[in-house]
Amino acid sequence: MSETGSVVRTFFERMEARDWDGAGTLLAPDLHIEFTETGERFDGGNFLAMNRAYPEGWSIEVVEVLAAGPRVAAQVRVIHRDVTFWCAGFYDVQDGTIRSGVEHWVTEGSESPPVWRRPFTT
């Protein structure tokens, strides 16, 4: 795996381990992360603080990480009690830290497929 991809994978692995200090070393001080589904933006240490404050009972699985130079994409599954969330995250990594990112979150099974697509599904 590339160095930049390893930074993102390691960040999520440290989050899963609740190694908050270790995870924080992988985030740039001027970090900004955007959540598209809510329009929220987290700057600096607020991103890690928000994750740390999230109610316990969750687990993270890094499904896939793809890197092309400083750009890294990650598919991550988060299970919290009986709900599964998916994150498709796209990050910029420089000098061994995540500098920015956009995360697209969905809740598995939370939406019914539209009727018009039924003829195309198996």
How does the language model describe each region?
Residues 1-122:
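C-terminal and inter-domain tail/linker signature
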